[in-house]
């Protein structure tokens, strides 16, 4: 049983939009978008297990994506007061034509400046 809270659905809509913008920023190497929307203490666990802080993540993001296409599926947003989980599946095509799938969980907190991503974890998988 979920204890998610979002009485009018507006936060869910905002988080769904932010999730899509996060992916768009990834595909376009939009470091400024990330700089604005990631918490200062942001941390990501990459699909290879490496852990990056915000500065390291921004450096990697500036290099551009290693994929040419990334489509979202199964986006699930759950809100718990001033925290939220966004989980989704991404179907991607690499620059070399390879294809794959990843699943991720992003953790957001609501601040006076709006929702900020504080954590992300990515898992590449062969399961669909």
Q: What annotation goes with each model-predicted range?
A:
Residues 2-36, 41-128:
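A beta-strand edge to alpha-helix "cap/lid" segment located at domain peripheries
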């Amino acid at each position: 049983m979920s204890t998610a809270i979002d009485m009018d659905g507006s936060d869910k809509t905002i988080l769904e939009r932010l999730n899509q913008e996060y992916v768009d920023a990834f595909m376009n190497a939009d470091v400024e978008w990330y700089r604005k929307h990631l918490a200062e203490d942001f941390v990501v666990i990459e699909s290879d297990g490496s852990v990056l802080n915000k500065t390291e993540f921004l450096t990697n993001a500036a290099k551009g994506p290693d994929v040419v296409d990334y489509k979202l599926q199964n986006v699930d947003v759950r809100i718990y007061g001033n925290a939220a989980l966004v989980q989704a599946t991404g179907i991607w095509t690499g620059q070399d034509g390879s294809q794959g799938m990843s699943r991720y969980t992003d953790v957001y907190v609501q601040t006076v400046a709006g929702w900020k991503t504080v954590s992300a974890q990515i898992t590449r998988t062969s399961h669909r």
